[in-house]
Structure formats: C-alpha cells, structure tokens
Curated annotation (Swiss-Prot):
The keyword Hydrolase does not apply. GO terms for biological process: endocytosis; endosomal transport. Component of the PAN1 actin cytoskeleton-regulatory complex required for the internalization of endosomes during actin-coupled endocytosis. The complex links the site of endocytosis to the cell membrane-associated actin cytoskeleton. Mediates uptake of external molecules and vacuolar degradation of plasma membrane proteins. Plays a role in the proper organization of the cell membrane-associated actin cytoskeleton and promotes its destabilization. Residues 120-136, 1178-1188, 1222-1239, 1327-1352, 1361-1375, 1381-1411 have a biased composition (Pro residues). InterPro entries: EF-hand-dom_pair (IPR011992), EF_hand_dom (IPR002048), EH_dom (IPR000261), WH2_dom (IPR003124). Residues 72-83, 1156-1169, 1314-1323 have a biased composition (Polar residues). This is Actin cytoskeleton-regulatory complex protein PAN1. It holds the Pfam family WH2.
Length: 1450
C-alpha cells in the first residue's frame, strides 16, 4: 500500500519528464508521500531523524557549535517516535544509522573539514537537539557540496541562531588569484571582520596592509585601486584585490596605474552580490538557496515519506540495515560516490534509499525510459549529429587514437535505471589510465548529450542539483571531487547545469576516473562558448556603465539632467562612440515647454472650401476681445508686413535674375572654352583621334593581329630554310672554285657528313685512294705528284666557319626580329585591351559623346561641337593634303562623285588621308568600307615612308596615271573645302541665332517675352511693381549693350585669329610643297642609283656565268681528249694481250681457267680502277666522256647478269657507285648499267668465291702456302715459288679454295649464261666463262673504284653479241689490267697479288692491297714477264702493303 505511492513519487521525481529531487517541490513530495493527515508531522519527524543526523554532519564547519548537533539529534529522535506509529520498524533505523555514522564519520570528519573549510552551514528549520557526535562528520560532506553550490545560501536557510558567515563571502572564484590564496584571504577577512559583517573598516585594512612593510605611496596607490566603491571600507573582493596588489609589489612587479577591466568587473560584481544579499538575508533567514542542490529542503520534506512508507514492509528493516551498511560506504563514497547520497539525499537519502527497497519503483519510471538506454550507446546513435553544430564554436576535438575506454560503461551506469537507489556505486569498472585530452571529444559530447536528454525528460534545458547528485553519484567518486566538478561546471552559481555545462562536469568526472586530478580552475578548452561570450558581453556592459557613471559624475549631469540638457540615451549604444551628437531630446532630458502649441486642425469647422481658414485660438485671441482701434492697428501692421514681403520678393527676384544672368554668362564662357579647347585639339598635330572604338572593331583588330602573329613562325621557318640553302650553296661553290684553283689538291673529297661536311671516313677513303695511286704509279713507272690535302681541308674549314658564322648571325637577326615583332604585337594587344570600355566609360561616352541623358541645350551644344570638330579636321586635312595626297586611298566602294554628293561620307572617308596628327583615326570611321580604306591608306603610307627612307620612290596606284590622280585629289580637296565652308556657315548662323535668343539684343521684345518663361518667379503684387520694372529694364539694356560690345570684340579677335591661322596654314602648305618636291627629287636620284647598281650586278653575273661556262667547256674538251687518248692506248694494249693469248691458247688450255680466275679477281679490278683514277684527279669531273660504240655494246653481258645473280647485282651496284664518289673522265660510265649507289663492299669471304668459281675442269695441284700474307709475302716466299711458275694459281689459298668449292658454287654465273651461244665455238678454252663471272666480283670488294670495265677491255673480255667471236674472251674486263693479268699462257706464274683476292681473308687484304702490283703494270711488262722476268723484284709492293694492309675501306 505504501510502496505504490512511494514508487509513484519516485517515478515522478526521477522520471525523465518530471523535476528531480530537490527541484523546488518539497510540498508536492510531502503530499505524495503522505496521503493521510500525518502529512505535516511525517515530514517533520522524518526529516529530523535521519536528515538532521546527516545535517548534523553536513555543516562540517559548524562542528564546534554544540547546539546544532543536539538540535538535530534530539529532533531526529523525536520524530522517529512519532513516525513509529505509522511505521514501527523506523525507530531502530536511526540507532543503527548512528552507529554506522560513528564508524564512518570518525574517519571522515577530519578530512572533510579540511577539504571544505569555507562550507556554509546547512539550513535547519527546526529546533536544535543534541545529536550523536558521529552525525556531524557525515553531514560535513554534504555541507562541503552545498558550500560549493551556494553563494551564501546555507546561512540563509539556517535559523537565526546559526552564524551568518556564509553571507559575507559569496562562493565565487576570483580569476586573478589562485584558489588557495582566495581561501587564505577569506579566512583572514573573516577573522578580521567578525561575524555578521560584510565590510572591513579602513583602520583594520590599514593595519593589515601595513604588515606588508610597503612604503606609504605604494599602499596609498593600492588602497585607491582596491576601494572601488570609494566608501572607505573594503568588501571581501576588494580586500582580496588589495592583498593581490601587495603581493605584486612584494614580488618586484610594478603596480598598474588602473585596474584591468576584467578584474574591475569581477570585483564590482562580487561587491554587488554581497550588498544585494544583505537585505535578502534579513528578510528570510530560513529561505533556501536556489542556486545549488537543495539538500535541506529535501531532508525536511522529501526524505521523511521515503523512509516512512517503506516501514510497513516486513523486510524494510533488513533492507534498511543493508542500506545502512551500504550507506556508510556510500557516504564515504559520497565524498567518493557522490550522488547516491543525493538520492538518499542528504542523510535523508540514507534513510530514504536504505530502508526503501520499494523505491526501485520510483526509478521504475526511469527504468522504463532507461532500460533501452542501459546498453552502451543506446541513445548515442540518433544524437550523433547533434554536437556537430558545436565543434566549430567549442573546439571539440577528435577521439584520440587510444580511444575512450569505459565510456560506454560510464554512460550505461549513469542512464536512468530501475533500482539504482539500492545500489552501492563504486569506481570499479570505470577507472582506467587512458590519455584524455583537456578538450571534450566529439564522441564524449555525443554521449553526454544523450545522457542529459535522458534525464531532462521535460525538456527544461537544465539539470537541477538533486538530479546531479543522483547522476554524478553513480560514478563512484568521492564527494569532494564531485563538488569541485560541479563548482567548475556551474558557471555563475546558478544551481543547475545546461547541456554544455553538464558535458563539462561529465568530462571532468571521466578524467578523474582515468587518473587525472580535477583542476582548481576551468581550463580555456572547457569553457563553453555561451559562458565565454556571456562573460565578454557582461564585461562590455559593465565597462559602458562605469564610463557612463563617470561621465555623469564628472559632468554634473547626475544632479539635474533636465537643466543640463545632457542626454543619457546617447551613451547607451553598443556601437556608438559615447559622445554627444546633436541636440535631440529624449526622455532623460524631457522638460515641458508651455510655448510649444500642438497642431489643431480646423478643417472640420469650415463650411466649404471657399471659406477662409479661421485662425488658431491658441495663437490669436478671440475677435470679440479686440476693440476697433486694435483691429485697425493690426490691419496696418499686416499691411506693413505685406509691403515688406513684396519688397523682399522683388529683391529676391532681382537677385535671382542677376544670378541667372551670371550663370548664363558662366555657361557661355564654358561653352566658348570648350569650343576653343576642341579646336586646339583638332588642330594640334599630336592630338588623339576623335571617335569611339566599338567593340566589334576592337575584336576585328585583335583577330587581324592574331592572324599576322600566327604567320611569324612560318616566315621565320622559311627564312631559316633559305639561310641553310644559301650556306650549302656557298660551300658547294667554294669547293668548285677551290678544285678549279687547285686541281691536284684533295679538295675533290666529297663530304658525306651533314651539310656536306667532310668526315673522318671521307678522309680515310681519300688517303687510301691516294696511296693506291702512288703504288700504281710505282708499278707503271709514272711519276705522280703527291699533294697534301691539309691546305684544301683548311681552306674548306675556313669557308665552312665563315658560312656557319654568317648563318648564325642571320639566325640571330631572325630571332631578334621575331622577338621584336612579338613584343610589338603584345604591346598592340595590351593597348587594345586597355582601351576596352567598362560600364563607367561606356556611360560617360554615351552621355557626353552621344548626348544621351542630358538637357536639350547641352545636347545641341554637343552636336554642334562634333560638327565643328569634323569640319575643322577636314580643313586641316586639306591643308596638309598636298604633302600626303599620293597616299590618299580611293575607296573601291564609293567613287569620288559619291563623296562629293554625300558630305558626311566625304568627311569620314577623306579623313584617312590625313596623317595621324590631323586627328583622324581608325575609330572615327563608322562603316567597314571606310575603315578598310583607312587601314589600306595607313599601310601604303608607312610603306611609302620606308621606301623613301631607303631611297626608293613610292609606287603609284596601278591603272591610274598622274593626271588622273591629280584630278582626283583636286576634286576631293574641293569637296572637302566646300563641305567645311558649309559647316562653318551653318554653325555660325546657329550660334548667332542662339546668342540672339539668349541675350535678346536684336529683338528686345522677344527677349523680354521669352525671359519670364521659366526664370521669373511669380510676380509680386501689382500695386508696387512699376518702379522695379523700370529699373530692371534699364539694367537689362545696360547689360545687353555691354554684352553686345563684348561679343563684337570677341568676333573681331576670332576673325584676326582665323586670318592668322589661315596665313600659317598657307605657309605650312608652301613649306610642305617644297619638301615634297625635294623628296621627289631625292627619290628619283636614289631610284636611278638603285637601277644602275642592279644593272651592274646583272652584268657582272652574266660575265661570271659566261666565264664559268667557258671554263667548264674547256675542261670538258680536255677531259674528252684525255679519255680518247687513254681509250686508244688501252685498246691497243688489250688487242696486244688478246693476240698473245691466242698464241698461247693451245699450250695453256688446261691451266687457263685457274690462272685466269685469280687474275680476274678483285685486285685486278681495283688495279684498273686505280690506274684509271690517276688522270681523274687533274681536272674537275666533266660529263661522261665520249667512247666508241663498240665498247659500249660489249657491256651487255654484265647487264644481263645483273638481273639474276644477287651477288653479281651487289657487286655491279658497288662498281656503279664508284663513279659517284670519284668520277673519272677516261672511264665510260654509260657502260655500267644504272643502279643505286652502293659504296659499301661486302665483307663476306664467300662472296668472292661465289662470284669467281673455277670452271668445271681438271683441278690444279694444291699448294700449302699460307694465305696470311694475302699475296704480299716476302721475297723469300716468292723465291720458293719460282719453280712453280708454270702453275700460277696452284700455290695460292684462293686457288685451293676455288678447287675445293668449285663444285659447290653455281656451275656458272647467271651473267655468263647468255654467252653460251656466242662462245660455243670456244668452249675448249675455259678462259671465256671465268672472265664473265669474275668481272663483277672485281668491282664489289672495293667501293671507291670508278665505273666498271673500261671501254678497252670490254670488246675482248665479254664475248657478247657485238664482240668478234674468234679471239678467246680475255680475263676480267678491267680497262688497264686486262692484258697482263689475264694472260692465259701457263708458263708465267701469276703475280703474287693475283692469288689472294679470291680466298676468304678480309677484303682489305684481298682488295686494294692486291690491286697495286697487278693494276700498275704497263703493256711492256707482259713481254718482260714472258721473257722470264721474276716478279719478286717488284719490292715496292711490300712497302705499300704495310701501310694499307688490314685497313677497312668504307
């Protein structure tokens, strides 16, 4: 029965939607708890029993006061008995409670008293009885918490018998001193002031301050700063400030001249709190403080029913005992566990929670709400987004990397739960050692906000002290820690915590659970933004109020503001400067003015609109009160006033007329000045053009500029290509000239490098050729002039350097031109951009140039000014047209006649003819045709100026004679003059008419009639207007006369100035005409000089070309003669050799192929080429020499074989390529079939074997001679082989290779297949096929050699259709070596150089080295060899072979 209402009470009090314990609802709690009559005694008795025991302990400071303890003790016992009737088990509870408290409080009494030395005594509304001593320490913990929450509230709730110390010093922290210092100063202040006093007298303060042993000046300054109220007494904050200043001085720091604003505001605020609290304390001593958890009220009201209702339950005593056992721990914990005592309340809570197992239903209301939230994070998820609005203001930080351990457990424990009152909370499971930052993390804020909303069921926006005791107590911390956390979080000692402050308190608790001490002062990271901003705003308002009070005090305005007229309202603005502004009246300076009469409408008293308005009775007395004389007097006075008004009006009108005339004169003067300035602009040579630049024109110019800029790279590339071609041509020309001047030099070397440069490979080839020539000369016995190629190379290098230098200079010039053009284009583009119009310039242009948005008079003036400016430009252009007439363009779209017909178009199209100084520009033309004509004219003019600077006469227009041009220019000038005269005449007429209208000189009546139109004010009364009209007319006549005289003078001056300008213009025209004639003469002279120079250059070129052609012709003839001589000589040798071969054919029939094959190898071919190249060095290479037709016909077999045999094709290419490198006049190039040049010879050793296979005959004896000497062996080897002369090829490796691989090679080269029909009769002579097949290989190994077979050798060498069949085919078709090496007779041994060519050794050994001995033999050497001369005597080969052997010729 009792548990239900009890539960209902608990549910209401602790539910999320109900106010919490001690939330100012003690009566409601009592009513709910006590359904029967014993309502009043029940709370009284209940509160006295346990509450007073805890209260006895609660006032920890009041331990020495014995009255309080007996008061509580006795009172507690009495109601227990009275309440025992309602609940029998209750009487035993206090005794056990007292025993438990004796054990706990004896341990806690001393520490609690030390922790809260300034705690206020708890309120006790009942009489004091003697309690047991242990209850006092238990209450000490509660008094400590209450002291931290109250600002003197404990004393107010205490009966009058209790001391009033708490009222003297509010529990407010001063920021400029530390907490320990404030505690010391408070103790000292209380000891000096005594009980019940709030201020310290000046004498006591002086005694205390003198103990600091500071000098008098310092103490005087300290007193001045500390006594902020100027009352001669010190409140506690002022005393603390004085002690703080003394400490500053003692530590060696200087005293500030004035207090900082924050210190001054703190001190004044605390002083005001102390002064305001005095009246409240005297008014109601038993009133409880609303700024802290209300422990006293809950003890007196809420707790008794809680204990009484559970008493009927049989198990209540057991539960109470268990709770008791829990309560001591809770109490010790409530210094440590904190908030359970809140539920158990004060000691109330002990009895309340202890005996109340049914109380769980009270949290059952919470339990229902909290059961879903018990799980960690139950309400966190939906509220995660809520703190996101705060981080930017509060500086929330991210969760540390280590996480937030036990935060979920803390949240789960502190959520409203069922049965929390019975639990004994400890820190077990919540403690940790995590790194927790000072600032609140976002995760923490989310959880704390969820916890706050769970407890704030009614959405009041705050958590009261009772709820805080219950919530924080569940953390298991001791009471002092929780009290300090509450004190730091409850800013302003409001007694409740809002959302941010609750988060701060929870964060401090969480830090404490992780081993961090609770600070003495809240760090800046934890100050909520609302608190911080509120403090700043409070400081600002306080400063404003201080300044205002000082201003009022100093100015004396505080005495009688209505008399001084000083308005306080002006100084109340947050944004104002504080100074007086204007004489505006407001409520602070209001004073009634009897003279100020309010408006009173009389319209309702009028009968009709025509009725006069009656005079206001407030200002005029009633007519009935005035006599007739008074009325007449008033009428006279009014008449006088009216006359004065008329005079004033006339005077004002005259003044207005004078001002109007002056303004008109000033305007006319401005007009004249503007016209003069415009004329100066038009006539000045450096004046900027007139006319607006349209955006379309600007864009067109930009596009044109871009197109021209894009052409620059292409032009530069073309210039560079031309420069390169010029340099190459110069080098080639120099080579030709040098070869002509030095025929025997090595300048004939053709460079294969870049740009025709001679590379090292070219030099190696040249040296190899020269050495071959020397060896050939040694063999033939001819003398060859060996010239060093150093001079030629040096000359060519110098010329190359010159050409390269000139090319680089030209390239630099081209780059400079490119850079300058780019800079110029960039400048033009920047000018075009800068000239762009923005909105302001466009508006100004439309207003002052297009006359939009101006008055009619100004618009007419603008149009007239534009017309005069245009006419002036035309005249100036015509004056200067004599000099620039040749450059005036004729627009293709508008012929001259059209220009004459259309003056406007004339003025626009003719202006381009004027130079820029005349004022015309591209922007002054409105149509595309005019602009195109202007651009064309400007381009022609600039081109003419440049040509004139170069001495070249400017070209005239095509299709226009001088007479036509003169007529056109004359017609244009006449049209311009006529148009200008018409414009001047019309402008002068308009000006005269305008002056006549404005001044009214010619027709005075008209001017008088026109004048009053808009200038005269309403005329004055007619009765006195005659005289002013006469005076005004006289003044106007005088003014008009003066103005007319002045105009006449100005007209004369203008005429004189015009005549002077015309004379100056004429003189300028004469000077310009003279200058033009002189320029024409100079141009003609320069043009004649240029023409003569061109003729001379052309004549010189023709002479040079003729001389060069003659020289070439002579050289060609000389080369042709030499070629003919050489061909005849070689033809003779070839015929002689063939005859000898025919004689010996029968004896050497078997060995012929072996002997011929090596003889037809590469050395023979190279030999012949070297011999043939000897005469080629002398002249420059002429065209192909003339050769006999039979020689050309014999070249068909090689051509035939060229299309099938790949090796032969390669060798024929190399032989054909040789003429490209060193063309020789005696050689017949037409003989060689055309093929792409192949300077590189094949290095494949089998290449020669395949090209020179042995015929299918009986093998020749094999020799074991080593081919390492490549046929250039020593004399000893040659002597050993003398006995084998009858077998020329037997002892050579080439012969051995040919024998071994003869069957492996193709049976016959494809080049010789076509010869079977022609050579069939001579099959018995094996000499015929080998020469055919061997002739191609002869050319392949050596790239340098000249064209293939010489003409003299082909008729006999190739038994083609055109060759006579009887003679056997000779050895290889070499021009000069065909005779000797190819001798078929067996007896003569082959020369040493003949054998090596075919074997596999590298081509250098078998190529050019072997060619020297065989190639240089003249025709007479064959007879000597046949006579028995040994070839070993030719020792010169060894010397030359050593120099060239092993070299690879590219």
């Amino acid at each position: 029965m009792y548990s239900n209402p009890n539960n209902f009470f608990g549910g209401n009090a602790m539910g999320p939607g109900a106010p919490q314990y001690g939330a100012g609802q003690p009566q409601q709690q009592q009513q709910q708890q006590q359904q029967p009559d014993p309502f009043a005694p029940q709370p009284t008795g209940f509160a006295q029993a346990p509450l007073q025991q805890q209260y006895t302990g609660y006032p920890g400071l009041q331990a020495p006061q014995g009255q309080l303890q007996p008061q509580f003790t006795g009172y507690g016992q009495t109601p227990q008995q009275g309440m025992a009737t309602g609940a029998p088990p209750m009487p035993a509870i206090p005794q056990q409670y007292q025993q438990q408290f004796q054990q706990q409080q004896t341990q806690q009494q001393q520490p609690q008293q030390q922790q809260m030395p300034f705690a206020a005594a708890p309120p006790q509304p009942t009489q004091t009885l003697a309690p047991p001593p242990p209850v006092k320490p238990q209450a000490t913990g509660f008094s400590e918490m209450a002291a931290s929450f109250h600002a003197g509230g404990g004393a107010r709730s205490q009966p009058s018998a209790a001391p009033r110390k708490a009222n003297t010093v509010p529990n407010i922290r001063l920021s400029f001193i530390t907490a320990p210092d404030q505690a010391k100063f408070e103790t000292l202040f209380k000891s000096a002031v005594g009980d019940g006093q709030t201020t310290m007298s000046g004498e006591k303060a002086r005694d205390l301050l003198l103990r600091s042993r500071l000098d008098g000046d310092s103490l005087s300054h300290i007193w001045t700063l500390a006594d902020t109220t100027r009352s001669g007494q010190l409140h506690f904050p002022e005393f603390a400030l004085a002690m703080y200043l003394c400490n500053l001085k003692l530590t060696g720091k200087s005293l500030p001249p004035s207090l900082p604003d924050n210190i001054k505001n703190e001190v004044s605020s605390m002083v005001d709190i102390i002064n305001f609290s005095i009246a409240e304390e005297s008014g109601s001593a038993s009133a409880t403080s609303t700024n802290a958890p209300d422990f006293g009220v809950r003890q007196n009201t809420a707790t008794p029913p809680v204990i009484q209702h559970p008493q009927p339950q049989p198990s209540s005593s057991q539960l109470l005992q268990a709770q008791m056992t829990g309560f001591p721990a809770q109490q010790t914990g409530f210094m440590g566990q904190g908030l359970q005592p809140q539920q158990t309340g004060m000691p109330q809570a002990t009895g309340y929670t202890g005996p109340r197992p049914p109380m769980p239903p009270m949290p059952t209301g919470f339990g229902s709400n909290l059961s879903p939230n018990v799980g960690p994070g139950g309400m966190i998820a939906p509220l995660n987004a809520q703190p996101t609005g705060r981080p930017g203001q509060w500086g929330l930080v991210n969760t540390p990397a280590t996480g937030l351990p036990n935060i979920d457990a803390l949240q789960a424990r502190m959520m409203p739960q069922q049965g929390r009152e019975q639990q004994d909370y400890t820190t077990a499971g919540l403690q940790g050692n995590a790194v927790i930052p000072w600032a609140i993390t976002k995760d923490e804020k989310t959880r704390y906000d969820a916890l706050f909303r769970a407890w704030d069921g009614l959405n009041k926006g705050y958590i009261g002290g009772d709820q805080a005791i219950e919530i924080f107590g569940q953390s298991g911390l001791e009471k002092p820690d929780l009290e300090r956390a509450w004190t730091l979080a409850d800013h302003g000692n409001k007694g409740r915590l809002d959302l941010d402050e609750f988060a701060v308190a929870m964060h401090l608790i969480y830090r404490k659970l992780n081993g961090y001490p609770i600070p003495n002062q809240l760090p800046p990271e934890l100050v909520p933004p609302s608190t911080r901003n509120f403090n700043e705003s409070l400081g600002t308002i306080k400063n404003m109020l201080h300044k205002e009070s000082d201003f009022r005090k100093n100015s004396g305005a505080s005495l009688l503001p209505q008399k001084t007229g000083v308005s306080y309202l002006k100084n109340h603005s947050f944004r104002g400067t504080g100074g007086a502004s204007g004489n505006r009246k407001d409520a602070t300076v209001f004073k009634n003015n009897d003279d100020a009469v309010g408006y009173r409408s009389s319209a309702r008293r009028r009968v009709g609109n025509a009725s006069p308005r009656p005079e206001s009775p407030a200002s005029v007395g009633s007519n009935e009160e005035l006599s007739l004389d008074q009325l007449r007097k008033k009428i006279k006075e009014k008449q006088v006033l009216l006359d004065a008004m008329d005079f004033a009006d006339e005077k004002n009108m005259e003044e207005d007329d004078i001002l109007d005339r002056r303004d008109r004169r000033e305007a006319e003067e401005l007009y004249r000045r503007i016209r003069r300035i415009q004329e100066d602009i038009d006539n000045h040579p450096d004046a900027s053009p007139i006319g607006g630049d349209s955006e379309a024109e600007r864009r067109a110019l930009k596009r044109q500029l871009q197109n021209l800029t894009d052409k620059i790279p292409e032009l530069a590339s073309q210039v560079r290509k031309t420069e390169k071609a010029i340099a190459d041509a110069r080098l080639e020309l120099f080579r030709l000239k040098d070869a002509k001047a030095h025929p025997g030099s090595a300048a004939a070397i053709v460079g294969t490098g870049p740009g025709g440069a001679i590379t090292e490979s070219d030099r190696l080839k040249a040296r190899a050729k020269a050495m071959m020539q020397q060896r050939t000369a040694a063999l033939t016995g001819k003398k060859i002039d060996v010239t060093s190629d150093q001079d030629a190379e040096k000359r060519l290098e110098e010329e190359s350097i010159k050409a390269r230098t000139e090319k680089e200079n030209n390239e630099r010039m081209v780059r400079d031109v490119e850079d300058s053009v780019r800079d110029f284009a960039k400048g033009i583009e920047d000018n075009l951009k800068e000239g762009g119009q923005d909105s302001t310039t466009e508006h100004e242009k439309r207003r002052w140039e297009d006359a939009l948005g101006v008055e009619d008079e100004v618009r007419d003036f603008i149009y007239d000014l534009q017309r005069s400016s245009r006419a002036s430009r035309i005249r100036s252009q015509d004056r200067q047209g004599g000099r620039k007439a040749t450059q005036e363009p004729v627009s293709a779209e508008a012929p001259p006649t059209a220009r004459v017909d259309s003056p406007a178009s004339i003025s626009r199209t003719a202006s381009p003819a004027a130079p820029p100084a005349a004022g015309g520009s591209y922007s002054s033309y409105k149509t595309p045709e005019e602009r195109a004509a202007f651009i064309k004219q400007q381009a022609e003019q600039r081109m003419a100026e440049r040509l004139a600077a170069l001495g070249i006469k400017a070209p005239t227009k095509p299709g226009e004679t001088a007479a036509q041009r003169a007529e056109r220019e004359q017609a244009e000038r006449a049209a311009k003059l006529r148009q200008a005269e018409e414009e001047d005449a019309r402008r002068e007429t308009e000006r005269q008419a305008r002056l006549a209208e404005e001044q009214g000189v010619p027709p005075p009546a008209v001017s008088q009639a026109a004048k009053p139109e808009g200038k005269k004010p309403p005329p004055p009364p007619s009765r006195k207007a005659a005289k002013p009209d006469d005076r005004r007319a006289e003044e106007e006549l005088a003014t008009k006369k003066a103005e007319e005289e002045r105009l006449e003078r100005e007209r004369g001056e203008q005429e004189r100035a015009t005549r002077e300008l015309e004379s100056q213009a004429k003189a300028q025209e004469d000077e310009l005409a003279k200058e033009r004639e002189e320029a024409d003469a100079r141009l003609r002279a320069l043009e004649e000089q240029v023409r003569q120079g061109k003729l001379k250059k052309e004549e010189e070129k023709r002479k040079k070309k003729a001389a060069l052609a003659e020289a070439k012709e002579k050289e060609a003839q000389l080369a042709q003669r030499r070629a003919e001589i050489e061909a005849a000589r070689k033809r003779e040798e070839e015929l002689r050799r063939q005859l000898e071969a025919m004689d010996d054919d029968s004896s050497s029939d078997d060995e012929g192929p072996e002997q011929i094959t090596p003889q037809a190898s590469t050395p023979t071919m190279n030999d012949s080429h070297i011999v043939n190249r000897e005469p080629e060095r002398q002249p420059t290479p002429p065209p192909a020499p003339v050769v006999s037709p039979p020689q050309i016909v014999t070249s068909s077999p090689p051509t035939e074989g060229e299309s099938r045999n790949p090796y032969f094709r390669m060798m024929s290419h190399s032989s054909d390529a040789s003429p490209a490198t060193a063309p020789a006049p005696p050689v017949a190039p037409p003989v060689a079939p055309p093929a792409p040049p192949q300077p590189e010879a094949s290095t494949n050793p089998f290449h020669r074997i395949a090209q020179a296979p042995a015929p299918e005959t009986s093998p020749v004896p094999v020799t074991r001679r080593r081919p390492d000497d490549d046929g250039w062996g020593s004399d000893k080897d040659e002597e050993d082989e003398e006995s084998d002369d009858d077998r020329p090829g037997g002892k050579s490796a080439a012969a051995l290779a040919s024998i071994l691989f003869g069957t492996m090679a193709p049976p016959r080269p494809l080049s010789a297949t076509g010869d079977k029909s022609a050579t069939s009769p001579t099959v018995s002579s094996p000499v015929a096929p080998p020469p055919e097949s061997a002739s191609p290989p002869a050319a392949s190994p050596s790239a340098p050699p000249p064209p293939p077979p010489m003409p003299g050798s082909f008729p006999s060498a190739s038994p083609g259709p055109g060759a006579p069949p009887p003679p056997p085919p000779p050895p290889p078709p070499m021009p000069s070596a065909g005779g000797p090496p190819g001798a078929p007779p067996a007896p003569p041994p082959p020369p040493p150089g003949m054998a090596p060519p075919a074997p596999p050794p590298p081509p250098p050994a078998g190529g050019p080295p072997a060619a020297a001995p065989a190639g240089g033999r003249p025709a007479g050497l064959l007879g000597q060899i046949q006579a028995g001369k040994a070839l070993k005597k030719t020792t010169t080969r060894d010397k030359s072979a050593a120099a060239v052997a092993g070299r690879v010729l590219d």
